[in-house]
Amino acid sequence: MKRRIFLRNSAFGALGLAGFGLPGFRQIQATAASPDIRITGVETVRFRNAHWMWLRLHTNVGITGTGETYPFNEANTSVIKDLEWHSWAGKLLGTNPLEIEQTWERIFRQNAFHVTGGAEMRALSAINIAQWDIMGQVCQLPLYQLLGGSINKKIRVYNTYTNSRAINGWTLEEDMEKIAEFLVSEGIQAIKFCPFDRVARRNNGEYISWKELEGCLDWIRRIRDAVGYDLDIGCEFHSMWNLPSAIRIAHALEPYHILFLEDMLLQDNMQAYVSLNQESDIPLVISERLASRFGFREMFEAGAGSIAMYDLTWCGGISEGKKISDMANTYYIPTMMHTAGGPILWYASTHLAAAITNLFYVESVYPTWHDRDKLYFKNPPQVNNGHVLPPDLPGLGLQFIDGLFEQEDVIVEKIS
């Protein structure tokens, strides 16, 4: 069925493709229940030098939705193939892409029949993001409107800094002061970095001496000496430490008024986090490594942390991210979004961040949104004076650069 006929039959013809008025509930309900929109093609898109991949869902009405996940893209692609070729509940071909909750539940339950998490959850996250992209295009509304509207007119970001994602070639060891001063000049209010990771790797996370501790704290002092409290500081630990070392580090950081401590321990023992949380005056962030609201439930119930952080391409997608934030809000816990993947994760995170009521920060990485994402899109969300906004276009608002999918380093694989 042609797109024009579909729009007319689904009661959206009167709105027109350029219309942005909010359609009534009956119109949306009629479209979602319509047998006329179906997934007719599933394909993956990989880039030879990228650690992330895309999933594209094509429909019989000419609308294509695009999702994303990362890393381990061979495993992610294999899961999508298995869902499509061998599964008893996960097939996408021929289904209605607007049945977002139904799709999530049947794939999640099939995956949980074997094991929950890993590549299966990453694949489900990509599927969910692609479906929401389709929903927005069908309704001719930006995604944040479908998620409840833009309660956050400006979305506050912090900047994660590593030497592999450097600004102007500056390294943390040599140029900490320049980095801090640059971020402040850009209006960015907080930095996150990993001053303790080198010691954790050397000692396997089992011990940190006072001398080693002082060496790590020097990085913090250099920021304070350069810009004072114009730049908040968050510390990332990559779950490398044991409990006694984490307590020692947390106590040592307290005089420096640190914004948060992220993933000090592995996420598989919330009672250990409860012990750490009782010892630390600094808010604990847990954890983009958790998948689905079921993974976060124990954190909330145990009182293990102060801030919930998730990654939309890992936790189950946009649907699940919204549920995690809403669940956190019942405990008066704010949420943050991890965005260390590809450009579509960045797009999706800005949309959800605009709509949730308990947003703390969204992670940003200056070289990715400022430079990398422009290699793929005409309109990647840009940080302005420390804040970002989602595109005001239907769905995710993706505007691919011309000829992107024909480039030599792009691998497009048709799954079904």
What are these regions (language model features)?
Residues N60, T64-C139:
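Metal- or metallocofactor-binding catalytic centers and their adjacent structured scaffolds
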Residues H58, H86, T95, Q102, ...:
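Shared catalytic-loop signature of beta/alpha-barrel
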Residues G62, I127, Q140, I191, ...:
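Conserved, mostly hydrophobic/aromatic
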Residues K154-V274:
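Metal-dependent enolase-superfamily TIM-barrel catalytic cores that perform enediolate-based chemistry
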Residues G21-L57, T64:
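C-terminal segment of N-terminal export signals and the immediately downstream linker at the start
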